């Protein structure tokens, strides 16, 4: 059966350079389509970066559009950007929905659209750093309740930059992305996600052009905002620091 691209965009080879780094388009598009779904449906919708009908996401990071029959399989592996791939995985694991990894994405499998996207799993030749990054992001997703059932709020966006929050019942996760080739200083109005006006945020994950880290770092919140310096093609995931308090009866409680 021949399905026209207008019906199934996954089969399209369209190249839209005008949308590269267009955060306005991303925010408006996501808001538009998410508004058509009820919350229970959104929470179980599969968040996929790749599938059997589309080119592999890692291949899409090289901005080469085409088919394996014309370009050859090697072209799908040239000029790929693992930092952009990690950005995408971070969004996949922190967005509303059920993160769904197409086999091999976690191992660095490349490929143009079907049939090239169905390459075999690279046993013994996996990109181990990418595999470990997926494991870390899965741990964060499983550990942080707002990432599973929390609300979503866009906090700030501009060309190549996006910050959003997942939050519920006094818990917040803040995600910041810089998808540009430049260093960026980003001011985030975290108060909009019910983060206290003054306090601290702790880093859970930071990925940049060279690698990633889960080492803890602290960011100050002043007047409901926090300022972060973002590297090239980077993503930062953080949450408020909860200070333990002891009441007059010796009972501990946490607060931001």
What are these regions (language model features)?
Residues 1-114, 142, 152, 156-159, ...:
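Conserved alpha/beta catalytic core and glycan-binding cleft of carbohydrate-active enzymes
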């Amino acid at each position: 059966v021949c399905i026209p691209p207008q019906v199934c965009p996954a089969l399209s080879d369209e190249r839209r350079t005008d949308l590269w780094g267009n955060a306005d388009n991303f925010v408006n598009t996501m808001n538009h389509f998410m508004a058509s779904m009820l919350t229970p449906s959104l929470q179980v919708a599969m968040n996929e970066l790749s599938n059997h009908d589309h080119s592999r996401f890692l291949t899409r990071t090289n901005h080469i559009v085409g088919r394996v029959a014309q370009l050859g399989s090697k072209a799908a592996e040239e000029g790929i950007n693992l930092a952009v791939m990690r950005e995408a995985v971070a969004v996949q694991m922190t967005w509303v929905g059920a993160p769904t990894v197409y086999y091999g994405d976690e191992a660095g499998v490349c490929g143009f659209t079907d049939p090239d996207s169905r390459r075999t799993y690279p046993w013994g030749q996996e990109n181990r750093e990418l595999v470990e990054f997926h494991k870390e992001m899965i741990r964060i997703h499983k550990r942080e309740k707002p990432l599973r059932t929390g609300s979503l709020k866009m906090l700030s966006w501009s060309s190549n930059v996006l910050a959003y929050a997942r939050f519920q019942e006094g818990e917040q996760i803040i995600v910041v992305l810089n998808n540009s080739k430049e260093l960026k200083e980003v001011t985030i109005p975290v108060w909009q996600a019910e983060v206290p006006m003054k306090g601290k945020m702790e880093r859970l994950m930071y990925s940049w052009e060279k690698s990633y880290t889960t080492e803890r770092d602290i960011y100050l919140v002043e007047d409901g905002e926090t300022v972060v310096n973002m590297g090239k093609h980077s993503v930062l995931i953080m949450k408020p620091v909860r200070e333990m308090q002891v009441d007059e009866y010796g009972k501990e409680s946490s607060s931001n």
